[in-house]
C-alpha cells in the first residue's frame, strides 16, 4: 500500500512539473522500440509506462479528469519538461514508423487535448523557429522604419545637390 501511495505521489510530482502531458498506448511495442522512443524524447520529456488506476488517482488529484476514459490498456505518458511541440513531433514521427504506438490524448496549458489536437501541436514549428521568425519580423520592421525616417533627409540632400548643380551650370 505504501508503494502505491509513493507511486501516486511521484506521478503527482511529474504532473506538477510538466509543461504538457501526452498519453500513449504502446501495445505490441518491443522493449527495444520503447527504449528508442525514450531516447528520442529524453531531451524534452520523461516517458514512463504507468499503471492506469494509479495514474487516474494522481491525475484527478491534480484536476485532470480528461484521462479517465483514455487510461485503458497498456499506457505510457510523456511528461514534457521542455518543448511540447518537439515531443509531439517525435511521438508522431515514431508512430508513423511504428504504428503500434497510438497517441491517445494530452493535457497542455490547463486544457485537455484530443489525439487530433496533439497532431496539430506536432504540426507547429518549434519554439526556436517561431522566435527566429518573430525576431526577423522585428528586424525587417526596424529597417523599414529606419529607411522611412532617413528618406526625407536623403531626399532633401538630393534636392539641395540638384539645386547646387543647376546653379553651377547656369553660372558657366
Swiss-Prot record:
One of the GO BP terms on file: translation
InterPro entries: Ribosomal_uL10 (IPR001790), Ribosomal_uL10-like_sf (IPR043141), Ribosomal_uL10_bac (IPR022973), Ribosomal_uL10_bac_type (IPR047865), Ribosomal_uL10_CS_bac (IPR002363)
Pfam families in the record: Ribosomal_L10
Signal peptide: none
Entry keywords, A to Z: Ribonucleoprotein, Ribosomal protein, RNA-binding, rRNA-binding
Disulfide linkage: none
GO molecular function, one term: large ribosomal subunit rRNA binding
GO cellular component: large ribosomal subunit
PROSITE patterns linked: RIBOSOMAL_L10
Family to which this protein belongs: Belongs to the universal ribosomal protein uL10 family.
PANTHER family per UniProt: 39S RIBOSOMAL PROTEIN L10, MITOCHONDRIAL (PTHR11560)
Quaternary organization: Part of the ribosomal stalk of the 50S ribosomal subunit. The N-terminus interacts with L11 and the large rRNA to form the base of the stalk. The C-terminus forms an elongated spine to which L12 dimers bind in a sequential fashion forming a multimeric L10(L12)X complex.
HAMAP family: Ribosomal_uL10 (MF_00362)
Function: Forms part of the ribosomal stalk, playing a central role in the interaction of the ribosome with GTP-bound translation factors.
Protein name: Large ribosomal subunit protein uL10
